[in-house]
Regions:
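Glycoside hydrolase catalytic-domain groove-lining segments
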Residues: 204-206, 210-332
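Acidic-and-aromatic substrate-binding clefts and catalytic sites of carbohydrate-active enzymes
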Residues: 19-26, 46-53, 75-79, 201, ...
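Catalytic domains of carbohydrate-active enzymes, especially glycoside hydrolases
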Residues: 26-53, 187-192, 287-291, 348-354
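Substrate-binding cleft of secreted/luminal carbohydrate-active enzymes
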Residues: 288-303, 310, 317-384
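Active-site-adjacent "subsite" loops/lids of carbohydrate-active enzymes
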Residues: 6-15, 19-22, 26, 98, ...
Length: 384
């Protein structure tokens, strides 16, 4: 099992959503310079999002029809942004773990979905559309909130109702995901690769013809239960996801055994019940080198409870476990005092580090306090 080469993981995600860091010339270099100055040591740059790559990919050109995301192509021309990020980061002592953010999720309208509709898994109603929701949205849903919050929620639902899911049992889907990850591992001097909560299968899916056929072959002709939460049906699909993960990791490690395979999931009960992502089994089987657990909570007691879950305790006995903290989003700003409190809580519990989602909300202008104040607090936290 590969392991991070330093004591405390201090990471941040670089994304293409509500952020200019990948698109504006000089932005990624400036971001990495500032991160190094504030004692960060890891970046997770997005390389797979909405059915496109964020590096020039021969495989994407062949299988999707575009070598990389069109807007980055338009804004940066021939610049390989992943290469730039790796060179700048390594020069300043930061590790780089490219982040395959969207995993198996793609927009219904994407080139990939249009070109290969048979690669998509379906609900029992025969729809390829799905609804992605993480724990943060699930908790916010319990409180309807004010008019603005309800408007944001309906806008979000309109957007995500257009999502589809690649079938993890489809050989060509496996070939695509594996091929993209191998392309990055073989062509760039990366320190690792990262998957997150999108690398699973929504529990309402799995009723496409291919999955049904495989299930019938293994169940003497019997069709999958109509109850999406049937225990055996959930275990069967989760086991198929685990088999895919096993093959993926084995292939990556054959190419480079030192590559860190990082996973940034939601809590285990949520991941398994909603996305059939049985990461506790993945940890037990040695498939993950690093766990970066998403704990997006405003309430400190609730935050603390997540750190003490049984799956987290199991993982800590086997691999480095750090905590993914929300530093804010466009619609959900987070005060620096809350961030500080959460970092101190994580440290008190003896975890292996913290990482923040995402770059623009660390100390940019999407924040409740001045960038100067936020940078000063991060300096105090990380200069020790």
């Amino acid at each position: 099992v590969a392991s991070p080469s330093f004591q405390e993981r201090r990471g941040v995600w670089l994304t293409n959503v509500a952020s200019a860091v990948l698109f504006v010339p000089g932005s990624s270099q400036r971001a990495i310079k500032q991160l190094a100055e504030h004692h960060f040591n890891t970046v997770y740059p997005v390389v797979w999002n909405r059915g496109y790559t964020f590096y020039p990919s021969a495989l994407a050109k062949e299988m999707i029809g575009k070598p990389q995301e069109p807007f980055i192509n338009w804004t940066r021309g021939n610049v390989d942004i992943l290469k730039v990020i790796i060179e700048e980061s390594h020069q300043r002592g930061l590790e780089v773990l490219p982040w395959f953010e969207y995993g198996l999720m793609i927009p219904r309208s994407s080139l990939l979905a249009q070109k290969h509709p048979d690669w998509l898994t379906e609900s029992k109603e025969g729809s390829a559309n799905t609804f992605f929701q993480d724990e943060l949205e699930a908790k916010n849903e319990k409180n309807n909130g004010n008019l603005i919050q309800r408007w944001r929620k309906s806008a979000y639902e309109r957007q995500v109702s257009q999502l589809a899911w690649l079938n993890p049992l489809h050989p060509e889907v496996q070939q695509l995901i594996k091929g993209l990850m191998l392309e990055v591992v073989m062509n760039y001097p990366v320190d690792g690769v990262q998957l997150d909560d999108h690398f699973g299968m929504p529990v309402e899916l799995g009723y496409d013809p291919l999955t049904v056929k495989i299930y019938q072959q293994e169940h003497r002709g019997k069709s999958p239960p109509k109850d999406t939460h049937n225990g055996e049906w959930m275990r069967w699909r989760a086991a198929k996801m685990t088999a895919f993960m096993t093959d993926l990791v084995k292939t990556i490690k054959t190419i480079n055994p030192d590559i860190i395979v990082s996973l940034s999931p939601n809590s285990h009960p949520f991941s398994y019940q909603n996305y059939l992502q049985d990461w506790k089994t993945w940890v037990r089987r040695g498939l993950i080198d690093e766990l970066v657990l998403q704990v997006y909570r405003n309430d400190l007691n609730s935050f603390n409870r997540e750190l003490h879950q049984s799956a987290v305790k199991l993982a800590r006995k086997k691999i480095p476990v750090s905590i993914r903290i929300l530093s804010g989003t466009l619609n959900n700003t987070v005060k620096i005092e809350q961030i500080k409190e959460q970092v101190e809580t994580v440290r008190k519990q003896g975890f292996d580090g913290v990482s923040f989602f995402y770059w623009e909300s660390l100390w940019g202008y999407l924040t409740p306090e001045s960038p100067y104040k936020r940078r000063r607090i991060f300096d105090e936290l990380f200069s020790k």
